Amino acid sequence: MKKTITSTTTDYKSKISVYFKREIRMNINYDNNNILQLKGKIIETPTYSHSVLGEGFFETKIEVKRLSQEVDILPITISERLLGELKVGDEVAIKGQFRSYNKLEDMHSKLMLTVFVRELLPLDQAPVINNINLVGYICKEPIYRTTPFGREIADILLAVNRAYNKSDYLPCIAWGRNARFVKDLQVGEKLEISGRVQSRNYQKKIGEESITKTAYEISISNICLADEPTPLAIDNLIITPTDSSTVATI
Protein backbone atom coordinates (compact mmCIF):
# COMPACT_ATOMS: atom_id res chain seq x y z
CA MET A 1 0.00 0.00 0.00
CA LYS A 2 1.23 3.47 -0.86
CA LYS A 3 2.06 5.75 2.02
CA THR A 4 0.64 9.24 1.56
CA ILE A 5 2.04 12.24 3.40
CA THR A 6 0.52 15.70 3.42
CA SER A 7 3.70 17.70 3.75
CA THR A 8 4.55 21.21 4.75
CA THR A 9 6.48 23.45 2.38
CA THR A 10 9.71 22.61 4.21
CA ASP A 11 9.07 18.86 3.91
CA TYR A 12 8.28 19.19 0.21
CA LYS A 13 11.45 21.14 -0.53
CA SER A 14 13.54 18.73 1.53
CA LYS A 15 12.23 15.77 -0.51
CA ILE A 16 13.04 17.52 -3.78
CA SER A 17 16.52 18.31 -2.43
CA VAL A 18 17.10 14.54 -2.25
CA TYR A 19 16.96 14.48 -6.05
CA PHE A 20 19.29 17.46 -6.30
CA LYS A 21 21.93 16.01 -3.99
CA ARG A 22 21.81 12.71 -5.86
CA GLU A 23 22.41 14.51 -9.14
CA ILE A 24 25.34 16.42 -7.65
CA ARG A 25 26.97 13.09 -6.81
CA MET A 26 26.39 12.00 -10.40
CA ASN A 27 27.94 15.22 -11.77
CA ILE A 28 24.83 16.07 -13.80
CA ASN A 29 24.97 18.85 -16.40
CA TYR A 30 21.88 20.81 -15.38
CA ASP A 31 21.74 22.69 -18.67
CA ASN A 32 20.56 19.44 -20.27
CA ASN A 33 17.59 19.16 -17.88
CA ASN A 34 15.66 22.01 -19.46
CA ILE A 35 16.18 23.04 -23.10
CA LEU A 36 13.62 25.22 -24.87
CA GLN A 37 13.60 26.68 -28.38
CA LEU A 38 10.96 29.12 -29.61
CA LYS A 39 10.44 31.25 -32.67
CA GLY A 40 7.83 33.98 -32.67
CA LYS A 41 6.93 37.65 -32.54
CA ILE A 42 7.26 40.15 -29.69
CA ILE A 43 3.77 41.50 -28.94
CA GLU A 44 4.31 43.64 -25.82
CA THR A 45 6.71 46.44 -24.97
CA PRO A 46 9.37 45.00 -22.63
CA THR A 47 9.04 46.25 -19.05
CA TYR A 48 11.62 46.18 -16.26
CA SER A 49 11.24 43.27 -13.84
CA HIS A 50 14.22 42.95 -11.50
CA SER A 51 18.02 42.98 -11.20
CA VAL A 52 20.48 40.27 -10.23
CA LEU A 53 24.05 41.33 -9.38
CA GLY A 54 23.54 44.56 -11.27
CA GLU A 55 22.11 42.90 -14.40
CA GLY A 56 18.62 44.08 -15.29
CA PHE A 57 15.91 41.73 -16.53
CA PHE A 58 12.81 42.63 -18.53
CA GLU A 59 9.48 40.91 -19.16
CA THR A 60 7.47 40.79 -22.36
CA LYS A 61 5.33 38.32 -24.32
CA ILE A 62 5.93 36.37 -27.50
CA GLU A 63 3.35 35.04 -29.96
CA VAL A 64 4.22 31.56 -31.22
CA LYS A 65 2.24 29.94 -34.03
CA ARG A 66 1.21 26.30 -33.97
CA LEU A 67 1.03 24.15 -37.08
CA SER A 68 -2.74 24.60 -36.88
CA GLN A 69 -2.15 28.38 -37.15
CA GLU A 70 -3.52 28.90 -33.65
CA VAL A 71 -1.16 30.89 -31.46
CA ASP A 72 0.31 30.55 -27.99
CA ILE A 73 1.03 33.77 -26.08
CA LEU A 74 3.94 33.09 -23.73
CA PRO A 75 5.63 35.30 -21.12
CA ILE A 76 9.39 35.72 -21.48
CA THR A 77 12.11 37.09 -19.22
CA ILE A 78 15.20 38.49 -20.92
CA SER A 79 18.41 40.16 -19.77
CA GLU A 80 19.09 43.75 -20.74
CA ARG A 81 22.30 42.44 -22.31
CA LEU A 82 20.25 40.45 -24.82
CA LEU A 83 17.29 42.78 -25.15
CA GLY A 84 19.10 45.46 -27.14
CA GLU A 85 16.65 47.27 -29.41
CA LEU A 86 13.98 44.57 -29.49
CA LYS A 87 10.53 46.05 -29.91
CA VAL A 88 6.93 45.06 -30.58
CA GLY A 89 6.60 43.29 -33.94
CA ASP A 90 10.16 41.94 -34.06
CA GLU A 91 10.57 38.27 -34.97
CA VAL A 92 12.91 36.42 -32.60
CA ALA A 93 14.35 32.94 -32.17
CA ILE A 94 15.03 32.00 -28.57
CA LYS A 95 17.04 29.34 -26.80
CA GLY A 96 16.42 29.14 -23.09
CA GLN A 97 14.53 27.38 -20.33
CA PHE A 98 10.97 27.19 -19.00
CA ARG A 99 11.15 28.29 -15.37
CA SER A 100 8.92 28.80 -12.36
CA TYR A 101 9.03 31.33 -9.56
CA ASN A 102 6.97 32.51 -6.64
CA LYS A 103 4.92 35.70 -6.63
CA LEU A 104 3.03 37.04 -3.64
CA GLU A 105 -0.46 38.28 -4.54
CA ASP A 106 -3.07 39.26 -1.94
CA MET A 107 -1.03 37.54 0.76
CA HIS A 108 -1.06 34.28 -1.21
CA SER A 109 1.86 32.62 -2.97
CA LYS A 110 1.20 32.08 -6.67
CA LEU A 111 3.08 29.83 -9.08
CA MET A 112 4.33 31.87 -12.02
CA LEU A 113 5.87 30.47 -15.20
CA THR A 114 8.08 32.17 -17.75
CA VAL A 115 10.40 31.48 -20.67
CA PHE A 116 13.88 32.48 -19.48
CA VAL A 117 15.92 33.61 -22.49
CA ARG A 118 19.54 32.49 -22.46
CA GLU A 119 20.40 33.14 -26.10
CA LEU A 120 18.95 34.83 -29.18
CA LEU A 121 19.54 32.80 -32.35
CA PRO A 122 19.68 33.96 -35.97
CA LEU A 123 16.23 33.38 -37.47
CA ASP A 124 17.59 31.36 -40.38
CA GLN A 125 19.37 29.00 -37.96
CA ALA A 126 16.29 28.21 -35.88
CA PRO A 127 13.96 25.91 -37.84
CA VAL A 128 12.17 24.75 -34.67
CA ILE A 129 9.14 26.89 -33.75
CA ASN A 130 8.32 25.49 -30.30
CA ASN A 131 10.17 22.58 -28.70
CA ILE A 132 11.13 21.73 -25.13
CA ASN A 133 13.10 18.83 -23.67
CA LEU A 134 12.98 18.16 -19.93
CA VAL A 135 14.49 15.73 -17.45
CA GLY A 136 12.82 15.82 -14.06
CA TYR A 137 10.97 14.07 -11.26
CA ILE A 138 7.27 13.58 -10.61
CA CYS A 139 6.55 15.54 -7.43
CA LYS A 140 2.76 15.10 -7.17
CA GLU A 141 0.65 12.07 -7.93
CA PRO A 142 -0.46 12.28 -11.60
CA ILE A 143 -4.12 13.20 -12.13
CA TYR A 144 -5.79 11.11 -14.83
CA ARG A 145 -9.19 11.93 -16.29
CA THR A 146 -11.35 11.50 -19.37
CA THR A 147 -13.07 14.42 -21.11
CA PRO A 148 -16.79 14.34 -22.04
CA PHE A 149 -15.61 13.56 -25.58
CA GLY A 150 -13.69 10.50 -24.38
CA ARG A 151 -10.21 11.99 -24.63
CA GLU A 152 -7.73 10.74 -22.02
CA ILE A 153 -5.65 13.35 -20.19
CA ALA A 154 -3.12 13.19 -17.35
CA ASP A 155 -1.65 16.14 -15.45
CA ILE A 156 1.88 15.93 -14.07
CA LEU A 157 3.88 18.35 -11.93
CA LEU A 158 7.54 17.89 -12.82
CA ALA A 159 10.43 19.08 -10.62
CA VAL A 160 13.35 20.00 -12.86
CA ASN A 161 16.65 20.65 -11.11
CA ARG A 162 19.01 23.40 -12.15
CA ALA A 163 22.27 24.79 -10.84
CA TYR A 164 22.71 26.54 -7.47
CA ASN A 165 20.37 24.15 -5.65
CA LYS A 166 17.24 25.43 -7.39
CA SER A 167 14.35 23.57 -9.00
CA ASP A 168 11.56 24.55 -11.36
CA TYR A 169 8.09 23.08 -10.89
CA LEU A 170 6.49 22.70 -14.29
CA PRO A 171 2.92 21.58 -15.08
CA CYS A 172 2.77 19.07 -17.92
CA ILE A 173 -0.19 17.50 -19.69
CA ALA A 174 -0.17 14.10 -21.41
CA TRP A 175 -2.72 12.80 -23.91
CA GLY A 176 -4.03 9.42 -25.03
CA ARG A 177 -1.55 6.57 -24.65
CA ASN A 178 0.92 8.92 -22.92
CA ALA A 179 -1.77 9.70 -20.33
CA ARG A 180 -2.33 5.98 -19.75
CA PHE A 181 1.42 5.50 -19.39
CA VAL A 182 1.86 8.10 -16.65
CA LYS A 183 -1.34 7.62 -14.66
CA ASP A 184 0.11 4.91 -12.38
CA LEU A 185 3.63 6.31 -12.06
CA GLN A 186 4.88 7.10 -8.56
CA VAL A 187 6.14 10.31 -7.02
CA GLY A 188 9.92 10.29 -7.43
CA GLU A 189 9.96 8.63 -10.86
CA LYS A 190 12.48 10.29 -13.16
CA LEU A 191 11.13 11.18 -16.60
CA GLU A 192 12.42 12.43 -19.92
CA ILE A 193 9.85 14.57 -21.71
CA SER A 194 9.66 16.40 -25.02
CA GLY A 195 6.84 18.57 -26.28
CA ARG A 196 5.88 22.22 -26.60
CA VAL A 197 4.98 25.06 -24.26
CA GLN A 198 1.41 26.22 -24.67
CA SER A 199 -0.98 28.82 -23.30
CA ARG A 200 -4.55 27.86 -22.48
CA ASN A 201 -7.44 30.13 -21.53
CA TYR A 202 -10.01 28.94 -19.01
CA GLN A 203 -12.89 30.37 -17.01
CA LYS A 204 -12.63 30.85 -13.25
CA LYS A 205 -15.71 31.69 -11.23
CA ILE A 206 -15.27 34.35 -8.55
CA GLY A 207 -18.52 34.94 -6.72
CA GLU A 208 -21.19 35.37 -9.36
CA GLU A 209 -18.74 36.36 -12.09
CA SER A 210 -16.58 34.29 -14.42
CA ILE A 211 -13.22 35.69 -15.45
CA THR A 212 -10.83 34.46 -18.13
CA LYS A 213 -7.47 33.24 -16.85
CA THR A 214 -4.48 31.87 -18.74
CA ALA A 215 -2.57 28.72 -17.83
CA TYR A 216 0.88 27.85 -19.15
CA GLU A 217 1.89 24.21 -19.44
CA ILE A 218 3.92 21.71 -21.41
CA SER A 219 1.95 19.61 -23.88
CA ILE A 220 3.79 16.28 -23.99
CA SER A 221 4.50 14.60 -27.32
CA ASN A 222 7.03 12.01 -26.11
CA ILE A 223 7.69 10.66 -22.63
CA CYS A 224 9.75 7.85 -21.13
CA LEU A 225 11.23 6.76 -17.84
CA ALA A 226 14.81 7.83 -17.29
CA ASP A 227 17.33 5.14 -16.57
CA GLU A 228 17.73 5.41 -12.81
CA PRO A 229 15.24 5.13 -9.92
CA THR A 230 15.13 7.66 -7.09
CA PRO A 231 14.98 7.14 -3.33
CA LEU A 232 11.34 8.27 -3.26
CA ALA A 233 10.36 5.90 -6.02
CA ILE A 234 11.97 3.03 -4.17
CA ASP A 235 10.23 3.99 -0.91
CA ASN A 236 6.88 4.16 -2.74
CA LEU A 237 6.16 7.51 -1.09
CA ILE A 238 3.63 10.09 -2.28
CA ILE A 239 4.15 13.73 -1.29
CA THR A 240 1.18 16.09 -1.32
CA PRO A 241 2.34 19.70 -0.83
CA THR A 242 -0.09 21.91 1.05
CA ASP A 243 0.71 25.05 -0.92
CA SER A 244 2.57 26.30 -3.99
CA SER A 245 5.25 28.28 -2.13
CA THR A 246 7.92 25.72 -2.96
CA VAL A 247 8.82 27.40 -6.21
CA ALA A 248 12.38 28.52 -6.83
CA THR A 249 13.21 32.05 -7.87
CA ILE A 250 14.53 32.83 -11.34
Labelled PLM ranges:
Residues 16-250:
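Single-stranded nucleic acid-binding surfaces, predominantly the OB-fold ssDNA-binding core
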